[in-house]
Amino acid sequence: MDLPPASFSFFLPSVYDGTKLECRVHLPSMLQNIESATTWPNRGAIVAHPYATLGGCYDDPVVGFIGSELLQAGCIVGTFNFRGAGDSEGRTSWTAKPELGDYVSFYGFMLQYLHFLKLALTPGEEVDSSKPHKVSDGVKNRTDIHLILGGYSYGSLIASNVPTLDTMLDLFQFAPITTPTNKPTPMREIMSTAKRIAALSLEQIQMSHNLADVPDLRALTTSISYLLVSPLLPPISQFLTVFSTLSLNVKTDTPKGPHIPCPRPADQQSSHHTLALFGDQDTFTSAGKLEKWSDEMVHMPCSQFQFRMIDGAGHFWRENGVEVRARHALKQWLSEI
């Protein structure tokens, strides 16, 4: 079973340069009626698609079956088209830096969207926004919002390089409302869209709401995890970034917008629950290289990294029976985090 038709479709501006990105969200069955919605665990997941130049888009079949499994597990599943894919504006870059900005835009949307829903669905919960929030490395400790940062192939490369959660919260919490030319900043446009889609989601289950204009993203405890499907390793990953280190540039009307360094992917993936899912017949990265990398990640201090290698699976997951085994591995991991 693939992803069903989207619950909501919309466009977001990229924080990199304002490029319009085609986006959609799929709501799980628990959010179809008010009774089950109030007990929904507030889980979301992003699944980014493979390289647009080679035909990648959010309708990719691997994005579909991974997203379907996440949806069945109760996650709100969000997908978007990078620049140059589908009806998104622009074209694929040579450096992946614009695409990193695209992912960050949708990441920020999902954080705010889940935040709006959490406060609306648990109105009796006391939240003291004067206390500093706690970023959880896992969801075994109490957490209000859990977001899985996922991607397939090129999408996993971009997901691996996003800024830290603290940086993301600050970027969207303290974004200026307008640019010096009185245009809404991309971050504020994204927040407005998150509020609009949250309101539509609540109206769909006939639930009244009074959403804040600007959500306090630090009032709730948020945790993140990583899901990397057919991850790309050097030298392929280096070719796609022209051998440069990824960093985030944010659009402003000033000559030089904020430049945000990104953390080392290995540090983020070992310190948060992470699943790398790949086949032993991957044509882009050898099984030996993937196993060696995974073993090194597993043995980092206090690592929360896990991997599953699916026998007989290639990079495109078209071989007989491999999708079923991949779904089983993903379902097992989701039950553990």
Predicted stretch roles:
Residues 65-89:
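Conserved alpha/beta-hydrolase
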Residues 150-159:
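Gly/Ala-rich beta-loop-alpha elbow adjacent to hydrolase catalytic centers
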Residues 53-54, 90, 313-325:
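Catalytic histidine-centered segment of alpha/beta-hydrolase-like enzymes
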Residues 1-43:
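N-terminal cap/lid segment of alpha/beta-hydrolase-fold proteins
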Residues 270, 275-278, 282:
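Short beta-strand/loop motif that positions the catalytic acidic residue
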Residues 297-316:
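Catalytic histidine neighborhood in serine/cysteine hydrolases
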Residues 55-65, 287-288:
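The serine-hydrolase catalytic nucleophile loop
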Residues 62, 92-140, 168, 172-191, ...:
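Alpha/beta-hydrolase active-site loop
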